[in-house]
């Protein structure tokens, strides 16, 4: 809950604002796909490292079960919301990575209580959806690049 309130929710608000401010050719039904630079990737990775370290200690303080996979979930979640904010197609793969981590976490829980298997199935479907989302965003980026004469 702390990760969602302290990280995911604020980043989702920033992402919404970013998407509303960058419609594709003025068409509010489609966002302008963004390509991030190598320098931005470096900044993103440094920020991700800092957030991961911070939340590791927060999760450890609260005696979180499965501390390592839970921390990795924070990492992938932060990458996903950052890339969503930046309008990069890679956000979908980051969410997919987060789904994979959550599949592991819920599978561990399901070993103790089989009723959690339904949650595992749910995250498997989220993973499929995120993979399709990445494919769709790549197609949209290609269409936008072909339609824009000065696109790189």
List each model region and its residues.
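Hydrophobic core segments of alpha-helical transmembrane domains in multi-pass membrane proteins
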Residues: 3-11, 70-76, 96-99, 118-127
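Membrane-water interface of transmembrane alpha-helices
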Residues: 6-25, 138
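Membrane-proximal helix-loop-helix units in multi-pass membrane proteins
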Residues: 18-76
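Hydrophobic alpha-helical transmembrane segments
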Residues: 2, 41-45, 93, 120
């Amino acid at each position: 809950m702390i990760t969602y309130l302290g990280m995911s929710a604020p980043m989702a608000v920033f992402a919404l604002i970013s998407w509303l401010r960058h419609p594709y050719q003025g068409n509010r039904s489609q966002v302008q796909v963004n390509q991030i630079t190598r320098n931005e990737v470096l900044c993103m990775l440094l920020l991700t490292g800092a957030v991961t370290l911070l939340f590791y200690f927060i999760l450890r303080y609260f005696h979180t079960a499965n501390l390592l996979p839970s921390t990795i979930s924070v990492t992938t979640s932060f990458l996903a919301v950052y890339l969503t904010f930046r309008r990069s197609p890679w956000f979908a793969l980051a969410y997919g990575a987060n789904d994979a981590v959550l599949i592991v976490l819920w599978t561990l829980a399901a070993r103790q209580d089989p009723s959690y298997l339904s949650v595992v199935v749910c995250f498997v479907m989220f993973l499929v959806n995120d993979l399709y989302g990445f494919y769709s965003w790549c197609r949209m980026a290609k269409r936008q690049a072909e339609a824009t004469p000065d696109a790189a």
